[in-house]
Design a protein with these regions (language model features):
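Conserved alpha/beta-hydrolase "nucleophile elbow" surrounding the catalytic nucleophile
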Residues: 38-40, 109, 113-115
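Active-site loop/oxyanion-hole signature of alpha/beta-hydrolase fold enzymes
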Residues: 17-18, 63-112, 268
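N-terminal cap/lid segment of alpha/beta-hydrolase-fold proteins
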Residues: 2-22
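Flexible "cap/lid" loop of the alpha/beta hydrolase fold
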Residues: 119-163
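Conserved serine/cysteine hydrolase catalytic core
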Residues: 200-242, 253, 259
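Conserved alpha/beta-hydrolase catalytic His-Asp/Glu region
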Residues: 146, 159-217
Length: 316
C-alpha cells in the first residue's frame, strides 16, 4: 500500500479588517494546539516535517495556515483592482492570526513562527498576551532592517528565481542539500510582489526596539536562532531576549529556515522547548505520551522561578 502523510488540509473563511479570506490550513495531532507561522514569501509547506512527526503529534495539535496571498490561500476578491502595491502590516498580520485561532476555537494555543512569523510573536505578546499559552520565536529579533528593496519585485527580474536565490545564502551550509533546495523551491513559487510586500512588515513596520521592554512576561517566549542566519543574527536575537521578561534564548548551528532546511537538527533543538511547554500545561497533553514523559530528562529542565531571560548555546 502506498504511503500517506497524516496531514489533513482544509479551508476556513476568515474575516479581517473588512475583507474575507479563504484560508488554507493543514493540521495533525492531538493535545495542546500549536499554530505555526511561515516565513515571508513562502507558505505552510515549511512545516511539513513537524506536521508528520509522531512525537510532536502525540502531544500537540499542530496547525499551519497559509497567510492570504501565499500558498493555497488566495488574495481577497478584487485584488487585481488594488491601486497600491501589497504591503503586509503589523496590525493586519497580528489580527489575522488572532482571528484564525478564534475561528478554529483554539483555547490558548502555542504560536511558533519563524522570521516574520517569529517577529510577530513580539506583537502578540504586547497586544494579545491573554490569547496564548506560549510563544516560540524562531529567527526573530526586535528589528530587521534593510530587506524591503525594489529588486525583489521588478519587471526585468524573474521574481521567483531572484527571491529564492536571494534567501538561499541564509541557510546553513551544513543543512542537507535535499532540504535546502526544497526550501528554494517554495520561494520560487511565490506570487509577484508578495515577498517584497511581506518584507515591508519585516523591515519597516515591525520595529520593536522601544517596545519589547513593555512585554509583561505573562506568556513565556522562547527565542531560537541559527548561527548562520545573517538576516537575524544570534547577536540580534540575544540583544532582544535580554530585554524580554520570561524569555529564553537558544542559539544553535542552523540557518534562517530551521523547520525546512534541516528538520532533524531542528527537532533536537525544539524538543526540550516543547517538553517544557507540556510540563507547564500537563492537562492538555495528548493521549500517547510515552516518548515525551515529563519524568524523562530534557535539556535545561524546568523554567526558573524568576522571569529573567536565559541564554543557551546548543552545539549541533
Amino acid at each position: 500500500m502506498n504511503k500517506h502523510d497524516p496531514i489533513v488540509g482544509r479551508y476556513v473563511y476568515i474575516t479581517c479588517q473588512g475583507k474575507t479570506y479563504r484560508t488554507y490550513y493543514e493540521e495533525n495531532g492531538e493535545g495542546i494546539p500549536m499554530v505555526c507561522l511561515h516565513t515571508a514569501g513562502s507558505d505552510g509547506r515549511q512545516y511539513r516535517h513537524q506536521l508528520c512527526d509522531p512525537d510532536i503529534s502525540a502531544n500537540f495539535r499542530t496547525i499551519v495556515f497559509d497567510v492570504p496571498r501565499h500558498g493555497k490561500s488566495l488574495p481577497p476578491a478584487g485584488w487585481h483592482l488594488e491601486e497600491d502595491e501589497y504591503k503586509l502590516t503589523t496590525s493586519f498580520y497580528a489580527e489575522f492570526i488572532v482571528e484564525f485561532c478564534r475561528a478554529l476555537e483554539l483555547h490558548k494555543p502555542v504560536i511558533m513562527g519563524q522570521s516574520m512569523g517569529g517577529n510577530i510573536c513580539l506583537e502578540l505578546a504586547l497586544r494579545y498576551e491573554n490569547e496564548f499559552s506560549a510563544l516560540i520565536a524562531l529567527e526573530a529579533c526586535d528589528h530587521s532592517p534593510g530587506w524591503w528593496i525594489d529588486p525583489l519585485h521588478h519587471p526585468e527580474i524573474h521574481g521567483g528565481e531572484a527571491v529564492a536565490t536571494a534567501v538561499f545564502g541564509l541557510m546553513s551550509p551544513e543543512s542537507p542539500d535535499e532540504y535546502r533546495w526544497e526550501t528554494w523551491w517554495y520561494y520560487a513559487q511565490g506570487g509577484p510582489g508578495i515577498f517584497k510586500g511581506d518584507l515591508y512588515y519585516y523591515s519597516v513596520d515591525s520595529d520593536y526596539r522601544d517596545k519589547v521592554h513593555k512585554i509583561s512576561g505573562k506568556v513565556p517566549i522562547y527565542f531560537l536562532t541559527g548561527e548562520y542566519d545573517f538576516a537575524c543574527t544570534p547577536e540580534m536575537t540575544m540583544r532582544t531576549a535580554e530585554k524580554v521578561k520570561n524569555s529564553e534564548c537558544i542559539i544553535f548551528g542552523g540557518g534562517h529556515f530551521p523547520t525546512s532546511e534541516d528538520p532533524d537538527k531542528f527537532k533536537e533543538v525544539i524538543t526540550p522547548v516543547l517538553k517544557k511547554i507540556l510540563q507547564n500545561d500537563p492537562g492538555r497533553r495528548g493521549s500517547a505520551t510515552e516518548n515525551w514523559s515529563s519524568n524523562r530528562s530534557s535539556s535545561g529542565g524546568g523554567r526558573p522561578s524568576d522571569d529573567a531571560p536565559r541564554r543557551r548555546v546548543i552545539d549541533l
